[in-house]
């Protein structure tokens, strides 16, 4: 690969194959390649802070050395390549001066725009709401909350709003809940809360990613509550991203849940096959990778709905073809992507299946465990049975007890009902729901795997 940006992409793509998704997102995706300091036998990276610098060096330093030494990435051609990770230089902001929003706009990713967001039936409503919000001088809805599974484009749409607002010279703050917490604790410890409040309460657009992680942190929830109130009172636009609807964020204060629902809430659905193929083609273009049509169709059909995983599959095929000096064809794609097609939902617990179904249908787990005539609850109970039959060894008796069913024969009827709907393929909602539940199960199981591996 020619550019420094592509060298970084190639290194991270190879690293992503070696760790769980949650490890990659929390750690390795945070590092940046430093081409100016790097040489043929040593690679320098930046990490956002000292904690990440220490953690990544300890846990993944050897992995990065192995990748660079074995794959001869970019300019690193030595037999053994050393790796150094340093804390990235930070922009200093004077606590007494006005906040320089141009200096902190780097939190908005320039590459995520409305122009390169692939629109389909799964996300059209979200796209239209986001454009209206970004283009309006006063908030048309406030707050706006978009929710849905991982990798469906929520962060892209949040950054697109930020980029459009910056073009209009608006003051924009885009932050994750985790970074909001880190910043809050830092200013609290340094007794500089006036600077913290000036930064977050005096912007035109406050964009918060992973809002669900506010839960269970009383001091942070208290500060966010007052930040939200002041922004809302001053007609400043608030946009929130979450992996679930407000009522399903367990442990979040009721007063925050109610405020999240003041404006408009919209769900990002998993993409259908046509939209997935459009996404694959766009990602190929953005990464300057040429794939045969049949390979792009294969990726769309066999890789999960997670957009990041689709892009990872594209890069993985390209990297492996380069390393093996082989042409890209369908056989190569099948071989390279074999591990990505494994169904991580296998071996799910009943509790995870219940949680995945509940989140997908905006219900509480406790609601599903009790028999009800409400259509959405009845459907949820059938889906729990269906996925339990697919992914767990639990016998009929255990399933019946889990769902408080006295008639064990109901289990077979419930399973057959869902199976028939899916086989007939007449109900796009059910088909989409199946994929969403599978994605959520994959996420839950990946988190469990990452937790166990860290013990």
UniProtKB/Swiss-Prot annotation:
GO terms for cellular component: cytoplasm; plasma membrane. GO terms for molecular function: ATP binding; ATP hydrolysis activity; DNA replication origin binding; lipid binding. Its main location: cytoplasm. Residues 75-106 are annotated as: Domain II. The keyword Lyase does not apply. ATP binds at residues 151, 153-155. Residues 107-321 are annotated as: Domain III, AAA+ region. Keywords: ATP-binding, Cytoplasm, DNA replication, DNA-binding, Lipid-binding, Nucleotide-binding. Disulfide bonds: none annotated. GO terms for biological process: DNA replication initiation; regulation of DNA replication. It holds the Pfam family Bac_DnaA_C. The keyword Transcription does not apply. Residues 322-455 are annotated as: Domain IV, binds dsDNA. It is found in: Cytoplasm. Belongs to the DnaA family. Oligomerizes as a right-handed, spiral filament on DNA at oriC. This is Chromosomal replication initiator protein DnaA.
């Amino acid at each position: 690969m020619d550019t420094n940006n592509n060298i970084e992409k190639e290194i991270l793509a190879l690293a992503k194959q070696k760790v769980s998704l949650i490890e990659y997102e929390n750690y390795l995706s945070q590092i940046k390649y430093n081409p100016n300091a790097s040489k043929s036998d040593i690679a320098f990276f930046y990490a956002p802070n000292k904690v990440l610098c220490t953690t990544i060096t300890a846990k993944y330093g050897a992995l990065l050395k192995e990748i660079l030494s074995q794959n001869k990435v970019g300019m690193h051609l030595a037999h053994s390549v050393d790796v150094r990770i340093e804390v990235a230089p930070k922009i200093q902001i004077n606590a007494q001066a006005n906040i320089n929003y141009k200096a902190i706009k780097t939190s908005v990713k320039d590459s995520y725009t409305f122009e390169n967001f692939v629109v389909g039936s799964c996300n059209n409503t979200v796209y239209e709401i986001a454009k209206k919000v970004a283009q309006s001088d006063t908030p048309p809805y406030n707050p706006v909350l978009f929710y849905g599974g991982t990798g469906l484009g929520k962060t892209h749409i949040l950054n697109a709003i930020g980029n459009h607002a910056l073009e209009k010279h608006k003051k924009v703050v885009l932050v994750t809940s985790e970074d909001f917490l880190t910043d809050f604790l830092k200013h609290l410890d340094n007794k500089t809360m006036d600077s913290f409040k000036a930064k977050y309460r005096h912007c035109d657009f406050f964009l918060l990613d992973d809002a669900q992680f506010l839960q269970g942190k009383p001091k942070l929830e208290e500060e966010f509550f007052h930040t939200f109130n002041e922004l809302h009172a001053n007609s400043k636009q608030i946009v929130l991203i979450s992996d679930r609807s407000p009522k399903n964020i367990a442990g979040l204060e009721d007063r925050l849940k109610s405020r999240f629902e003041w404006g408009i809430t919209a769900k990002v659905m998993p993409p259908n096959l046509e939209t997935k193929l459009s996404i694959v083609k766009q990602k190929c273009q953005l990464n300057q990778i040429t794939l045969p049509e049949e390979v792009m169709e294969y990726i769309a059909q066999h890789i999960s709905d997670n957009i990041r995983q689709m892009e990872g599959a594209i890069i993985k095929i390209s990297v492996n073809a380069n390393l093996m000096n082989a042409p890209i064809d369908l056989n190569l794609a099948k071989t390279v992507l074999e591990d990505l097609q494994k169904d991580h939902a296998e071996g799910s617990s009943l509790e995870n299946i219940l949680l995945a179904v509940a989140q997908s249908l905006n219900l509480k787990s406790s609601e599903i465990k009790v028999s009800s005539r409400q259509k959405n609850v009845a459907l949820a109970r059938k889906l729990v049975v269906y996925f339990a039959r697919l992914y767990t060894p639990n016998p009929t008796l255990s399933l019946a007890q889990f769902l408080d069913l006295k008639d064990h024969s109901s289990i077979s009827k419930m399973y057959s009902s869902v199976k028939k709907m899916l086989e007939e393929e007449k109900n796009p909602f059910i088909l989409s729901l199946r994929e969403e539940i599978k994605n959520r199960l994959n996420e839950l199981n990946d988190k469990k795997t990452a937790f166990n591996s860290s013990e």
